[in-house]
Amino acid sequence: MANNYKDLFIDIDSFDETNIIYVKPLLFFEASRHMGIYYEKEIIMKKPVVNPSNKSNKSKKLNKTNKSNKSNKSDELKKSNKSNKSSALKKSNKSSNKSSNKSSNKSSNKSSNKSSNKSSNKFPDKSDKSDSSNDSDNSDDSDDSSNDSSEFETIKTKKKQKIIIKTPKMIVPFGVKEFDNNGRKNYQMSLSFSTMTNLYNEEEIKKFHGFIKLTDKINEETIMDYKDTWKLPKGLKYKRSLQRLSKDYPHHININMPHDEKMGFMFNVYDEKGGKSKPDIIDKRSIVSAIIELTDLKFTDTEFRANWTLLQVRKFKPYSPIQEFFMTECFICDEDNPEDTVYSKLIEKYQQTLKTPITFPQYPQMNPSHSSSGYAIPYITPYQSNYPIPYPPTYPTTYPTTPLFSEPTIPKPPQQPTTEPPSGFKPPSLSELLSAKKLLKPTKTTVKGVTEGKVVESDDHTSVADIPPPPPPPPSISSDNSSPNKSVKSSTKSSTKSSTKSSTKSSTKSSTKSPSKTPVKSPIKSSSKLSDKKSPTKKIESSGESDSESDSESDSKTTKKSTNKIKKITNNKLENSNTKNNKKFSKKKTISLDK
């Protein structure tokens, strides 16, 4: 029964109203007011059929095979007898030539040969029989199988059963309703024929609506035709199964939910996953699919109606399988964003469900504009970059083409590394160097341990800086300790002579260079008291001469390259040299006065 449970359902498309049977019980409408309804369903079965012509053909074939076997056996016996006789004659000739002592052996051989010949004649080979019989059997079996496979007989039988139908997914508009019938509880559930369910089953609901409408019509017509014969009340009316609250609402059908006070509900309720549950899960506006049965017709004094009973019910989700599919994952890909991973996640999830990995098409299939010699650059989709191709294509090996007359290629000379200066460094220009020279401050040479003296005004209105003399030199080491004064006198004389000579020389030089220029007063301060000791003028004069000579040499070089600015600098230096000469003349005057 479990394997053929679909045979219990009645197909709405092939429903025949003439097969409906009404069964009137005993003492109808007096004792029992229920009338049974059944349906004669046709069941088609196929059986293999064996025709009588096939039987006669089989008998003829068997007779032919037996005759052929007999003829083959007789031919074999004749051949065996001839061969035995010829062998016996040859042996007898040979035995006559031999001695009489072997006569007994010959007789025994003859007797044995005869016995073997007889046995072979009486019992031919069994292997031949078995082979021939097997061949005939196989041929017969093949003929039978061919006949059986080609011909079947269709047998139609009628089965009397209840009208059982599986409803499509429908809405429960009011939920489960409970009634009290004289202390007994009755439960009822309604199914709406509304097509606003977003379940894509409008056609199935229309077919079911037409089937219920047809059964209502047949029930009403048959009962009204037999109302007088069955002695039913004259004012009896039929209450249709398709009910409607108003024109604003669709039709609905009421289904009884069998219930017993001891056993409870006598049907099963299943949840969305197919597990057993309680009727409490069937709420208002829930979507269910039920198996219902047209059990009987119930009569009262005023009306009669069809009794639809619930056999099984299952609750479903309030949306279609397509909508449920789109609720599992995100299927909206952002084609403008290359970093979008929605499509890659879908492919990964799909690959996990497959037993074998997805084989992507090769490049020639994706880009058919490839040439016969080689492959063109493949077109890569925006989502293909995230996934490597499991089977990379094998490109043909390309060989470099060489021209017929190729020119010799000269190797390039090795490039020496060039040491470039850093980008931030630039050598200074000549103008920058000259401007930097201007900024240098003039320095003053000083001697350690020598204090500056006062400025003494001479008769010629010239100021001279009186520099105090340095300490006396150490005494010379000599053998005579009694002549220290002589050494002092000689040193003073030599110093005076050298100072006079150097002063005259420097004065003559300065006078020749700048005869027209007047001497400039020096801003050097002198001390208040003049020292009586002699100053070493020779050393100071020599240092001044070396400075003037170095300055004159540098001036001569710069005048050739520099502009008018350099000439001004040379003039200033000449003025400084004049001031030094004036100082020397003033020093001579002071020395002469001391003397």
Curated annotation (Swiss-Prot):
Q: Composition bias, kind Acidic residues: at what positions?
A: 137-146, 544-553
Question: Pro residues bias: where?
Answer: 410-420, 467-476
Region Disordered: list its residue ranges. Answer: 50-159, 398-430, 450-595
Which portions of the chain have biased composition (kind: Basic residues)? 559-570, 581-595
Q: Where is the composition biased (Basic and acidic residues)?
A: 123-132, 454-463, 530-542
Identify the domain of life: Viruses
Q: Where is the composition biased (Low complexity)?
A: 83-122, 398-409, 421-430, 477-529, 571-580
List the taxonomic lineage.
Viruses, Varidnaviria, Bamfordvirae, Nucleocytoviricota, Megaviricetes
Instruction: Name it.
Output: Uncharacterized protein L291
